[in-house]
Amino acid sequence: MYHQLILLALIGTIMANVIPFSLSNISEEYKEFIPEEVRNFYKGLTAEDKEILRDLASKHATFANEDAALEALKDKSDKLYKNAVELRNFVKAKIDSLKPDAKAFVDEVIARARSLRSDDGQKFDTDKIKQAARDIIAKYQALNEETKEELKVTFPPIAKIISNEKLKRVASTFLQKN
C-alpha cells in the first residue's frame, strides 16, 4: 500500500502540471497535499483563464510537445502563459535536481501520466489509469532505498500522503477494483 501512495502522490503532483483542472473539484481535506505553488497557480485563475485552459486541453493531441502547447497558450493570454511557465520551471527545477535514477523514474511517470489523457481532453480511462499505477508501482519497488528517499525529500507532498491513513485506504480500494 505504501508504494501505491507514492505513485498517487507523484502522479498527483506531476499531473497538476500536465492537466488543467479546477481546485474547486477537490475536497478541502485533500487540498493540503497539493504543492503550494500549484495551489497558487490555480487560485489565480480567472473564469476566462479556466476557459482558455479547457480549450487547450481539449486540443492537447494537436500539440507536438509541451512547448507547442505553451506557445498556443501565449497566443491566448500572455499573463497565463507567464504563470504557466513559472509553474513549469518550478517543477522542472525539482526534477532537474534529482540524481539520474530518480529523474528517470519521474520522467517516466510524467510520460505515463500524459499518455493517460484522452484525445478529446475530457475523459480518462479508469482501467488504463489502474494499469499505469500498477506498472509504476512495480518500477518504484525496483528502485533502491536511496532513490526512494530522494523522491520523498524532493517532493514533500509525497511524505504527507504516505502518512495519511485515509488516503492509504482510498488508494488501496481504487487499485483493487477491476
Curated annotation (Swiss-Prot):
Q: Pfam families from the xrefs?
A: Gp-FAR-1
GO molecular function terms here?
Answer: fatty acid binding; retinal binding; retinol binding
Q: What's in the keyword line of the UniProt record?
A: Coiled coil, Lipid-binding, Retinol-binding, Secreted, Signal, Vitamin A
UniProt key word tRNA-binding: no
Question: InterPro entries, from UniProt?
Answer: Gp-FAR-1
Where in the cell is the protein located? Secreted
PTM remark: Not glycosylated.
- Protein's name in the database: Fatty-acid and retinol-binding protein 1
Name of the gene this protein is made from? far-1
The Swiss-Prot or TrEMBL record describes its family as follows: Belongs to the fatty-acid and retinol-binding protein (FARBP) family.
Gene Ontology CC annotation, any one: extracellular region
**Signal peptide location:** 1-16
- Its biological function? Binds retinol and different fatty acids.
Q: Which residues form a coiled coil?
A: 67-89, 129-154
Q: Does the keyword Acyltransferase apply?
A: no
